[in-house]
Amino acid sequence: KLSLDDFYKSDLHWRQEKIVDVAKKLASEMGTDVTASYELETLDTSFEGVYSSQSSLPHDKDQLSYLSLDEFEDCIVIDHQNNQRISVYDLEKATGRDPYEMFLSGSLSLITIENPNANTEKELILFRDSFSSSLTPLLIPGYAKITMVDIRYIQSDLLASWIDFDNQDVLFLYSTLVLNHGELLK
């Protein structure tokens, strides 16, 4: 169950270190296990999310933290939008204009994550927006491959050329901002 403490004060996104139970519940419902011994890492710089730029009132700053796992270093993460390999966490983006983009390099149209250390052959297709960027790393231990698709940035008729729909788990994970504007999902 999510509470206000699970979200940043200055941003609409949830805090990765607060949603491990959410990842475990989702994984359990899909028949996989994502239990892992994460290491909590906290960045030295403060995080001022989207609410900070929308208000002229004083506001609280957040600390941006993430959960590391040695297994992430072995993952092959491909950003197909820009045809390049990326990391699970891009620490350079953590000091940029939108620090939340440190999670899987932000909102990209198509990302694949291959986990050579997975104890399963299960695959996940995740239709998502930016909210899943911090959740997806927590699902990596339960899957051999995760394909992240943001259909706001890729034509749905092109999906079959990128994704082989054959016995994968499928998860639709969108914020209320996207769900309340269904035209974004066409």
What are the residue ranges of the model-derived segments?
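Extracellular glycan-modifying ectodomains
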Residues: K1-K186
